[in-house]
Structure formats: structure tokens, C-alpha cells
Amino acid sequence: LAYSCNVSFATIGETLDKGSYRSTAEELLFNKDLPYDGVYNSSQFKISADSPDDAIPQTVIGQGDTKITPLHNAMIMSAIANDGVLMKPYTIDSIENDDGAKIKTFHPKEAGTVMTADEANILTDYMKGVCEYGTGSGYFSGLSYQVTGKTGTAEFDNEGNCNSWFVGFSNPDDPDIVVCAITEQSNVTGVTGAWVARQVFDAYYSK
């Protein structure tokens, strides 16, 4: 996981039961409505018990027909940081009148449990390696705060063009914030999702 080895993921994926694979994805709200009141695109997971075996490797490494939004990715990472409990996203902290008095305040709300605390802790430990010595270490090692997360690269054509992802959270022993960043055509711009996420984390801890 730390080195984002596609061959390892694909090999493991070939041992999975396709029906169980789909049900696990749907437990994480793929093909489902998100507990969010705003506008969003639903994430899609196409593998089923009837899918051909050659569809598995591409899906396991995050390619193929799987689609996920930054919002959904951040929600899953938030659940990992929160011992498996999914939180309902909200975009407005409070509403004030013209005198500056708060007339309505919004608060975090739980939206269910999507994994056990043990499963969340295992994933957290794996993702620490990404930022300590793996694919994200060039961005997140040696900081005054610790980041746990996962890098990702999504090719979208046959010419090598790709989007760069990073999703993670800070200070895993007592989590602060989750950041999900995606940069389009990162192979052209040279700007990665991890670089963008680092700027957000730095801004948060510099305040």
C-alpha cells in the first residue's frame, strides 16, 4: 500500500469473491445516495458476480469503470479517522443576521457505521506508511504534524494523461482534518494532488 504497487493489488483482487467485493463497495456507499443535502454525483462501482475475471485487476487498482467523487472519498477517509463512523457533510457552519448574531448553527451528525474500529485502525496503520516512507513521503515526512493518507493516479485515455489524487487526514492519534485533492492532467501540469493537499494542511496548522 505504501508504494501503491498495482501488481500486488491486482494479485490480491483476483482472490476476491466478486459478489462480496461489490457488497463491500456498496457498504461504503458506492451506487448509493450519500447522506448529503447538497448537489453531488453518485459514485459508481460496476463489478458484480457476473463480471468477467479480467475486469478485476483494473478495478482493484482504481481504474476501469469505477468512479468516485472527492466528496465521497473524503467521507470514507473521515470514517477511517473516526473509527468507522461516517459523518454527514455540511458546508455552512452558521447563519448570522445583519447584527452579526448567530441565528442558526450547524453541528456534526453521524450517518452510520461503515466499518469496524479495528478495520479503520488497520487501514490507518497501512496509510501511515504512504506518508512516512512511501509515495507521499516527499510531501508529508518530517513535518510538525503527521499525515495519514493515500496517493492515487487515474489514467483517463490511451495517451498517458492522468489525474492525480490524494486523500488523507492529519494527526491520526487524535485526528484534526481530512483533505481530499485532485489535479487534472497532472502529467502535463506537474502539480499533484499530494502537493495541493500539503498546502491545505500547512495553511490549517499555520493559523
Q: Which residue stretches match the model-derived regions?
A:
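Beta-lactam-recognizing serine transpeptidase/beta-lactamase-like catalytic domain environment
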Residues: 1-184
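Conserved active-site neighborhood of the chymotrypsin/trypsin-like protease fold
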Residues: 6-8, 189, 194
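Short amphipathic alpha-helical face segments that pack within enzyme cores
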Residues: 69-75, 192-199
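Short, gly/Ser/Thr-rich active-site loops of penicillin-recognizing serine hydrolases
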Residues: 102-104, 194-207
